[in-house]
């Protein structure tokens, strides 16, 4: 049986980080019902899509460096390092790209709420594909969204310029296992 971070009132982020399984686990680490709820991740690979949420979120970087890329009008890129706090506005697509290992706590509302995984063309910037979902355990929906994107060349082909993109890289991401564990605990 694999261990994972437990929900508790106090938290040693760095000790709990050692219990994470892969990038973007987003394990809830506060007692159920705490809102906003802190979710812990240790990220080593670029997020495979832009995440769009219906609610505002806050991202706290505890260790490592990276960047948050926004698909706003200016295509803003925000560099993050230890101690940085980034505001992630609702309905603005954002993607985390670590430079090495990046430990982060995401403060988000309690699910379920609507989220979406979105992919944009590297050539022209057009939206290529978007999957919207509402789930108590969004990690399972993330996994299914990437699996669908990777299995359909049409979803990876830009409707504006015709450029076909490679499959989304998952690296050490294990959202399917995280979802199974969280569903098994009622988290």
Residue positions per predicted region:
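Conserved metal-binding segment of the jelly-roll/cupin
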Residues: 80-100
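Short metal-coordination and nucleic-acid-contact micro-motifs, chiefly zinc-binding Cys/His arrays
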Residues: 115-120, 151-154
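Cys/His-coordinated zinc-binding microdomains
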Residues: 122-126, 159-162
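Structural motif
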Residues: 65-67, 101-103, 127
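A short hydrophobic beta-strand segment most commonly corresponding to one strand
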Residues: 99-118
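A short beta-strand-loop-beta hairpin characteristic of the jelly-roll/cupin
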Residues: 52-84
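Short, non-ligating residues that shape and space the ligands of small metal-coordination modules
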Residues: 130-133, 167-168
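A short, N-terminal "cap"/entry segment at the start of jelly-roll beta-barrel domains
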Residues: 1-42, 46-50, 146-159, 163-187
């Amino acid at each position: 049986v694999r261990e994972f971070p437990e929900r508790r009132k106090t938290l040693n982020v760095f000790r709990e980080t050692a219990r994470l399984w892969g990038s973007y686990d987003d394990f809830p680490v506060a007692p159920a019902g705490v809102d906003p709820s802190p979710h812990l991740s240790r990220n080593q690979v670029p997020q495979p899509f832009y995440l769009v949420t219906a609610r505002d979120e806050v991202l706290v970087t505890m260790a490592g460096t990276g960047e948050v890329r926004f698909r706003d009008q200016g295509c803003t890129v925000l560099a993050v390092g230890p101690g940085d706090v980034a505001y992630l506005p609702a309905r603005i697509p954002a993607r985390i790209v670590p430079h090495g290992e990046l430990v982060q706590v995401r403060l988000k509302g309690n699910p379920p709420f609507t989220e979406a995984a979105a992919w944009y063309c590297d050539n022209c910037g057009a939206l290529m594909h978007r999957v919207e979902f509402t789930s108590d355990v969004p990690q399972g929906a993330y996994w299914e969204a990437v699996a669908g994107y990777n299995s359909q060349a049409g979803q990876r082909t830009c409707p504006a310029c015709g450029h076909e993109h490679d499959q989304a890289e998952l690296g050490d991401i294990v959202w399917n296992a995280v979802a199974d564990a969280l569903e098994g605990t009622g988290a």
